[in-house]
Amino acid sequence: MKETIAYLGMGMWGFSLANLLANNGHRVVGWARNPALIEQLSVQRRHPAAPHISIPQNLSFTYHMEEALDGATMIVEGVTSAGMRPVLTQLKALTELRVPLVITSKGIEQNTGLLLSEIALEIFGRPAAQHLGYLSGPSIASEVLRGCPCSVVISAYNPDTLKQIHRAFLTPTFRVYPNSDLKGVALGGALKNVIAIACGISDGFRFGDNAKSGLVTRGLHEIRKFATIMGCRPDTLNGLAGLGDLCTTCFSAFSRNTLFGKLLAEGLTPEQAKTKIGMVVEGVYTALSAHQIATHHRIDMPITTSVYRVLYENLDIQEGIAQLLQRDTKEEYL
C-alpha cells in the first residue's frame, strides 16, 4: 500500500528522507516555514544543500501546513529538537492525530528534559501513543540521498503502526529493523551527539584512533547506563540506535557534532564554533539536558559531564582532559 505522506521540515535530513519516501513510490508533500526555500524547491526542483539531486515528481512542497496534511495517511517530522514543540503545537491546532506520526529528529528538549516522543505525547495526549513512531540509527543525510546502503531502526508502541511505518520506509538499500523499545531508541540517538563532541575534541588534539575508540566505548557505557536507569532495554543501545549511530556520528567527516568538538580544540569558543558550522549542533543542547537528568538521578557520566562543563561552565578543555585521564580505573562495566 502506498501512502500519502506529509513531511514536516525540509532541512538536509528532512529532504533526504522525503526524497527516499517519494522514490519508494509514496506521494509526499514537504512542508517548511521558509517561503523562499519552498519556492526554490518547487520551481527549481533542487535543494540548496543538495543541488545535484533531482527531485521526483511525486514530491511536492508547501509552506501551508494544512495543505501538506490534506489527505495524509502518515506524518513524518524532521525538524530540530528546538523546533519540535512549536511545529507539533501548530500541527495539533490543525488536526487530531489519527494517522502515524514518525519522529526522525534526535535530541532532548531544553528546560523540560523531555524526549521528542514525550513532547508529542504531552501535546497530543497519551492516547496518541498508538500512532507514534520513532526512526533512528546511523543515517548520514548525504549518504541516504545518494542511495548508499543504510540500516536504521523504527520503533512504535502499537504493532500495527510499526508495520505501517516499516513498510513505508523499507527499500532495498534503506534497511529498516523493528524495535519495540521506543524510549531506548530515542535516547541512543540523542546522547550519542554529546560523545561525538568529545571525539571531535580528541580529533582536534590529534590524540589518535586509540583515544577515540576509547571515548566511543566508554561513551557507549555511559549511554547504556543512563538509558537503563531510565527504564530502557540495555540491548537497544548495543544495536543500531546506540552503537551504530554512535560510531557513524563519531567517525563521519559529515558529523556536525564531531566538527564542533574539533573546532573547540582548535581554540574557538562554543558560539564561534556554532557560527562557523552554520547549522544546529544538537549535542550542545543535549549536553545540558543530559547533565541535568544525570545529576538528578545520580548517574556517573564523566565524558558527558566534561563536555557539559566545557560548554556551560567555561572549563578549560585541557583541564577537562586531565581530569578524565586522572580518574580511577574501576572494573570496566561498573
From Swiss-Prot:
NADPH binds at residues 13, 33, 106, 141, 256, 280, 282. It comes from the Bacteria. HAMAP family: NAD_Glyc3P_dehydrog (MF_00394). Its EC number is 1.1.1.94. GO terms for cellular component: cytosol. PANTHER family: GLYCEROL-3-PHOSPHATE DEHYDROGENASE (PTHR11728), GLYCEROL-3-PHOSPHATE DEHYDROGENASE [NAD(+)] 2, CHLOROPLASTIC (PTHR11728:SF1). It is found in: Cytoplasm. GO terms for molecular function: glycerol-3-phosphate dehydrogenase [NAD(P)+] activity; NAD binding. Belongs to the NAD-dependent glycerol-3-phosphate dehydrogenase family. Signal peptide: none annotated. InterPro entries: 6-PGluconate_DH-like_C_sf (IPR008927), 6PGD_dom2 (IPR013328), G3P_DH_NAD-dep (IPR006168), G3P_DH_NAD-dep_C (IPR006109), G3P_DH_NAD-dep_N (IPR011128), NAD(P)-bd_dom_sf (IPR036291). The active site is at residue 192. Pfam families: NAD_Gly3P_dh_C, NAD_Gly3P_dh_N. It catalyses: sn-glycerol 3-phosphate + NAD(+) = dihydroxyacetone phosphate + NADH + H(+); sn-glycerol 3-phosphate + NADP(+) = dihydroxyacetone phosphate + NADPH + H(+). Sn-glycerol 3-phosphate binds at residues 106, 137, 139, 192, 245, 255-257. Keywords: Cytoplasm, Lipid biosynthesis, Lipid metabolism, NAD, NADP, Nucleotide-binding, Oxidoreductase, Phospholipid biosynthesis, Phospholipid metabolism. Pathway: Membrane lipid metabolism; glycerophospholipid metabolism. This is Glycerol-3-phosphate dehydrogenase [NAD(P)+]. It comes from Chlamydia trachomatis serovar L2 (strain ATCC VR-902B / DSM 19102 / 434/Bu). Catalyzes the reduction of the glycolytic intermediate dihydroxyacetone phosphate (DHAP) to sn-glycerol 3-phosphate (G3P), the key precursor for phospholipid synthesis. One of its GO terms (biological process) is glycerol-3-phosphate biosynthetic process.
